[in-house]
C-alpha cells in the first residue's frame, strides 16, 4: 500500500473510472469517498482522518456489505449478492493486504506465549495484543477463532 491517503487514491480512481466509463466501480468509489468524508466531518474542526481511521471506515463498509450478503441469502434474494461482492472487491483494493492464515496463527501463538495466557479469562488480553499487531489486516472473527484454538477453548 502506498503512503498517500486513501482519500487521495479514491479521488484518482474516480477520475480513472470516469475516463474509462466504468460506472459500477465509480459508484462504489463514490460511496467509499462519501463514507470517508462523513467520518472526517464527524471529527472536530481542523482535524483530519489518519491512515488507521481511513482503514477502519473502509473495513466497516466491507463488514456492512458482508452483512447485506447474509441478509440477502436469508430473505431469498441471493441474486443481489453479485453487486455486493463487486463492492467488496473494489473496497479491498484500497485496504492493506490481509495477513495469511499461517502468519496470523504464528502471531497468535507468539501473543499467547508473551501474555502467558492459559484460559478463557485471558482471551481478551491475547486478542488485544494480536489486533494491535495486525492493525486492519485481519478480521476480528478470524483472530478470535485462532485464539480460542490456541487456548484450547
What are these regions (language model features)?
Residues 1-153:
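Charged, compositionally biased, marginally structured helical/coil segments
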Amino acid at each position: 500500500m502506498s503512503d498517500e491517503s486513501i482519500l487521495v487514491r479514491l479521488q484518482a480512481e474516480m477520475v480513472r473510472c470516469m475516463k474509462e466509463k466504468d460506472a459500477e466501480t465509480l459508484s462504489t468509489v463514490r460511496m467509499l469517498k462519501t463514507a470517508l468524508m462523513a467520518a472526517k466531518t464527524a471529527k472536530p474542526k481542523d482535524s483530519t482522518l489518519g491512515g488507521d481511521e481511513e482503514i477502519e471506515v473502509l473495513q466497516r463498509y466491507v463488514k456492512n456489505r458482508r452483512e447485506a450478503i447474509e441478509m440477502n441469502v436469508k430473505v431469498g434474494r441471493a441474486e443481489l449478492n453479485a453487486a455486493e461482492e463487486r463492492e467488496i472487491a473494489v473496497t479491498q483494493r484500497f485496504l492493506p493486504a490481509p495477513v495469511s492464515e499461517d502468519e496470523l496463527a504464528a502471531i497468535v501463538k507468539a501473543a499467547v506465549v508473551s501474555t502467558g495466557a492459559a484460559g478463557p479469562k485471558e482471551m481478551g488480553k491475547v486478542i488485544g495484543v494480536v489486533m494491535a499487531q495486525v492493525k486492519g489486516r485481519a478480521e476480528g472473527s478470524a483472530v478470535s477463532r485462532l485464539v480460542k484454538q490456541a487456548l484450547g477453548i
